[in-house]
């Protein structure tokens, strides 16, 4: 990202940066809203959005279709049924200073043409750091609860919402026939601390903060887990209502309280900007005495008719704004830098600090982000902290941004020890000793150990047995964790080959699996049968199961079609030599063949070559291949195929086969499949519940057929 002033950007630079910002913000939206695993602080995220908005303001002709200024939240998880919001759940614009708040009020006055003498009432309430939820009531009964999702479609979490005591199942008093109540699900600080203690005692993962704990608890597939987590709910607004039941925001809140909802008692109405700024400062001072996390104050125009007149701008209402609290800072001594290995192999540096207190919380660790952040120079050569690097022994400035993730933001150069030396980031994984590499254009260094890295092992095994890989029934998350942590050699599963030797090892063991709680003779027999049924597997599924970075289902199918046998693929991966810019060498023939496959390219090719260059991975694969056989890919017969070279999209529910099977079959017959519909799509196969894709197809003039017509189309070609 160009750090220079926006006014100095050329059109080309602005266009490139807007493209980068769109992708980067979308990535962080997914991490925060869907995965509950943010990588950056709220302040850093807000800075990205501000930068995007400022560039768009200066170059309006460059505003992209996928601009973050038009989008809310992130795509929803596939774990839950989709739920369409009757009215969009919008996000709020942010204010970061008193000047921003004055400007917000002035914009409203200008838009409404209000004279200075007319009082404009504003409500103010703490901005809860939790998970937004929409509750739909019909005839006074809760019928649906949905997360924000992308603002239009959320996740249906009704069963879990019913377990939250603050959410009434039946409304009280005189209420509209239909009412959607919006609010925030959160976890109190004391309950959060108790939950993490319980998780530690059970040997389970702990949560980084109350917001992640609340989001993770609400998104459980087992509502009994949600019920045990002590979630709470503050109502703060309404979506769709069948009749008007209040004239002001404050009256609405009072009514919601009468209906049985919990309303934040700190919500107040003010008549001047000076008063709401005073309220902001008061709450900021008191925030750590509250039993829940807040990251600012939300201001709303009190008059609901004025709210309606003001309307919305893109992704947010004109009549509301979030005044964010600044991040708090303190100085600490950097005692050490630890390198942690994440589930995907990412090496993440963590600062170990002398204990300090920020905002009432003792901080001993802080984020250092990545290798470049420590060096003080970005991967594109741009300076970070004006080029100052971070060293062990430095006095560093710690920021607890967004009340969530402490991070090192700068150093006090005057206090640096004279004999200090620059930190050398490891190029070997501290968990397994494999090479840790950086892809071109990425700031993260990743372990290539893959199948043998203990830091990644459980997730790798889970991926290996997943539905679209080996699809071994009876090896779910709990079972994989049990076998991985088993102390007995006859029970442990640390590598994929261990799955297929389990039955043989058990035959010689005194500790029998069927005698262990949670298993039994019947279930163990079913598990062995499920394992043995996968000793032969299609090549594409095998390649996907290996978990090579960037080799998802689509690329695995492309590679299988290109090489047709595992031996040919492995030989190509072993022989491929990547280009070397330093020596001015081009890639060899095997490299060119690999990277010229449609959709593969240098990035995917590099990941494949790195994977096979690790001796550990080759050793694990050799043992695995003694137990299983990847089946040769049958060549595509396109000459007589009625769908060869066509772009096909599947939507809705199919009765004769799953959508994944239908996609695989279409590709075997020479078609290209896509998850999204465009004007280039040739055919939409629509089952029941097709939804928006069906409407789009009609708009674009795309041919639409049902499943029966699809079956007739491919009859006789099913290879």
From Swiss-Prot:
Gene Ontology CC annotation, any one: cytosol
GO MF terms held by the record: DNA binding; DNA ligase (NAD+) activity; metal ion binding
Q: Which GO terms describe its biological process?
A: DNA repair; DNA replication
What UniProt keywords apply to this chain's record, in alphabetical order?
Answer: DNA damage, DNA repair, DNA replication, Ligase, Magnesium, Manganese, Metal-binding, NAD, Zinc
Give the EC number(s) listed in the UniProt record. Answer: 6.5.1.2
Residues of the BRCT domain:
638-719
State the needed cofactors, names only: Mg(2+); Mn(2+)
Residues binding Zn(2+), per UniProt:
429, 432, 447, 453
PROSITE patterns, A to Z: BRCT, DNA_LIGASE_N1, DNA_LIGASE_N2
Annotated binding of NAD(+), by residue:
42-46, 91-92, 125, 148, 184, 300, 324
Q: Which Pfam families match?
A: BRCT, DNA_ligase_aden, DNA_ligase_OB, DNA_ligase_ZBD, HHH_2
Q: Please name the PANTHER family in this protein's record.
A: CHROMOSOME TRANSMISSION FIDELITY FACTOR 18, DNA LIGASE
NCBIfam families referenced in this protein's UniProt entry, alphabetically: dnlj, PRK07956.1
HAMAP family under this entry? DNA_ligase_A
Record protein name field: DNA ligase
């Amino acid at each position: 990202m160009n750090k220079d002033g926006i006014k100095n950007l050329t059109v080309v630079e602005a266009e490139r940066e807007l493209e980068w910002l769109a992708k980067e913000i979308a990535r962080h939206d997914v991490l925060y809203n869907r995965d509950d695993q943010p990588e950056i602080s709220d302040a850093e995220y807000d800075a990205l959005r501000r930068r995007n908005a400022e560039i768009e303001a200066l170059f309006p002709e460059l505003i992209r279709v996928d601009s973050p200024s038009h989008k809310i939240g992130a795509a929803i998880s596939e774990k839950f049924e989709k739920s369409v919001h009757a009215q969009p759940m919008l996000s709020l614009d942010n204010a970061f200073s008193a000047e921003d708040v004055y400007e917000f009020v002035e914009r409203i006055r200008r838009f409404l043409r209000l004279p200075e003498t007319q009082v404009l009432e504003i409500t103010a309430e703490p901005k809860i750091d939790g998970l937004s939820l929409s509750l739909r009531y019909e005839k006074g009964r809760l019928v649906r609860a949905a997360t924000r999702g992308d603002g239009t479609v959320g996740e249906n979490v009704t069963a879990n919402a019913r377990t939250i005591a603050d959410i009434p199942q039946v409304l009280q008093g005189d209420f509209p026939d239909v009412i959607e109540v919006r609010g925030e699900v959160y976890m109190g600080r004391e309950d959060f601390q108790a939950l993490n203690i319980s998780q530690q005692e059970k040997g389970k993962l702990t949560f980084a903060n109350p917001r992640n704990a609340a989001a993770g608890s609400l998104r459980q597939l087992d509502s009994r887990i949600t019920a045990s987590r002590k979630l709470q709910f503050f109502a703060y607004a309404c979506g769709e209502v069948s009749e008007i039941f209040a004239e002001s925001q404050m009256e609405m809140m009072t009514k919601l309280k009468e209906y049985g909802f919990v309303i934040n008692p700190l919500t107040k109405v003010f008549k001047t900007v000076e008063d709401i700024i005073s309220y902001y400062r008061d709450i900021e001072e008191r925030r750590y005495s509250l039993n829940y996390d807040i990251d600012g104050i939300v201001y709303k125009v009190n008059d609901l008719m004025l709210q309606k007149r003001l309307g919305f701008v893109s992704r947010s209402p004109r009549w509301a704004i979030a005044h964010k609290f600044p991040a708090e800072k303190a100085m600490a001594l950097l005692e050490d830098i630890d390198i942690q290995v994440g589930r995907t192999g990412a090496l993440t540096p963590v600062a170990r600090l002398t204990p300090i207190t920020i905002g009432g919380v003792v901080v001993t660790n802080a984020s250092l982000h990545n290798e470049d952040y420590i060096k003080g120079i970005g991967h594109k050569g741009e300076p970070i902290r004006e080029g100052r690097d971070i060293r062990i022994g430095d006095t560093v400035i710690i920021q607890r941004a967004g009340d969530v993730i402490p991070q090192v933001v700068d150093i006090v150069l005057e206090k640096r020890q004279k004999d200090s030396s620059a930190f050398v980031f490891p190029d070997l994984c501290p968990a397994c000793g494999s090479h840790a590499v950086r892809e071109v254009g990425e700031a993260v260094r990743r372990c290539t150990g893959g199948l043998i890295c203990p830091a990644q092992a459980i997730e790798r095994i889970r991926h290996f047995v997943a539905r679209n890989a080996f699809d071994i029934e009876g090896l779910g998350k709990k079972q994989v964790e049990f076998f991985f942590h088993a102390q007995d050699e006859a029970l442990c599963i640390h590598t994929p080959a261990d799955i297929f030797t389990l039955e043989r090892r058990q035959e010689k063991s005194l500790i029998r699996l069927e005698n262990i709680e949670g298993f039994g003779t019947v279930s163990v027999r079913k598990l062995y049968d499920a394992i043995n049924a996968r000793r032969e597997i299609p090549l594409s599924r095998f390649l996907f199961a290996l978990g090579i970075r960037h080799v998802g289902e689509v690329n695995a199918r492309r590679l299988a079609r290109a090489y047709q046998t595992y031996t040919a693929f492995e030989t190509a991966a072993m022989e491929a030599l990547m280009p070397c810019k330093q020596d001015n060498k081009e890639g060899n023939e095997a490299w060119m063949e690999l990277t010229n496959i449609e959709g593969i390219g240098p990035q995917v090719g590099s990941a494949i070559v790195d994977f096979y260059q690790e001796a550990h991975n080759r050793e694990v694969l050799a043992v695995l291949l003694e137990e299983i056989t990847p089946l040769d890919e049958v060549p595509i017969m396109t000459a007589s195929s009625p769908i060869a070279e066509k772009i096909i999209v599947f939507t809705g529910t199919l009765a004769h086969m799953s959508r994944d099977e239908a996609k695989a079959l279409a590709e075997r017959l020479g078609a290209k499949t896509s998850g999204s519909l465009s004007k280039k799509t040739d055919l939409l196969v629509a089952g029941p519940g097709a939804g928006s894709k069906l409407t789009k197809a009609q708009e674009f003039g795309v041919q639409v057929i049902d499943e029966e017509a699809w079956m007739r189309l491919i009859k006789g070609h099913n290879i």
